[in-house]
Curated annotation (Swiss-Prot):
SUPFAM superfamilies reported for this sequence: Acyl-CoA N-acyltransferases (Nat)
Active-site residues, record numbering mapped to chain: D168
Role of this protein: Acyltransferase required for the direct transfer of medium- to long-chain fatty acyl moieties from a carrier protein (MbtL) on to the epsilon-amino group of lysine residue in the mycobactin core.
Complex and partners: Monomer.
UniProt-recorded name of the protein: Lysine N-acyltransferase MbtK
Induction (record text): Induced by iron starvation conditions. Transcriptionally repressed by IdeR and iron.
Binding site for substrate: H130
Keyword Acyltransferase part of the UniProt annotation: yes
Length: 210
């Protein structure tokens, strides 16, 4: 059994991430956790820590994120969610910042280890991305089109085996769907999952001319 990350969190490593698959071929099961992408200043990305749980709980209980993510949990549940990711290899929790101020939450995950792999022909090295902006005043202000190309470029550079980055917004999330379409993602249809209807998109890695 994996040792908990910090004292007082004895049950955290036992928490299962709701979307994680375990019926995996060895090639997928053996994958290390996703690599950490990077951004040039004034923006930044870092791996989330258990000490971020209070901040994330406050963010995710804000109405715009509670509606979009349905992760409006108390800090204790966020510590469990973060610990399960940090102790595993399926998903990497990240904190985004600008000018040194934390303001975003991202999860970069192996799509073949995620429930979305039930709905398309997943490659073992496909990665998926979820992202949230904490400050409502910054939503729909151009941060998505500004930062998404930089983040995905770093993901593709850090993991050259990855040929696609997947996005699965709720089918009613028109803002994220527009961003996916603006970025050039291929639409793979709407699909009913266990608790919602998602719109599935794939962003192909850029090809290099010979």
């Amino acid at each position: 059994m994996t040792k908990p990350t910090s004292a007082g969190q004895a049950d955290d490593a036992l928490v299962r991430l709701a979307r994680e698959r375990f019926d995996l071929p060895d090639q997928v099961r053996r994958l290390a956790r996703p690599p950490v992408p990077s951004l040039e200043p004034p923006y930044g990305l870092r791996v989330a820590q258990l000490t971020d749980a209070e901040m994330l709980a406050e963010w995710m209980n804000r109405p715009h994120l509670a509606a979009a993510w349905e992760y409006d949990w108390p800090a204790s549940r966020w510590r469990q969610h973060l610990n399960a990711q940090l102790e595993g290899t399926y998903s990497l929790p990240l904190i985004g910042s600008w000018h040194g101020t934390d303001g975003g939450y991202l999860e970069l995950y192996w799509a073949a280890k995620d429930l979305i792999s039930h709905y398309y022909d997943a490659d073992p090295y496909d990665l998926g991305l979820h992202a949230a902006i904490a400050d409502l005043s910054k939503v729909n202000r151009g941060f998505g089109p500004l930062l998404l190309p930089r983040i995905v470029a770093s993901v593709f550079a850090n993991e050259p085996r990855c040929r696609r980055i997947m996005f699965d917004p709720d089918h009613r999330n028109t803002a994220t769907r527009r961003l996916c379409e603006w970025a050039g993602c291929k639409f793979l249809g709407e699909h009913d999952t266990t608790n919602r209807r998602m719109a599935l998109y794939a962003l192909e890695a850029p090809t290099t001319a010979a």
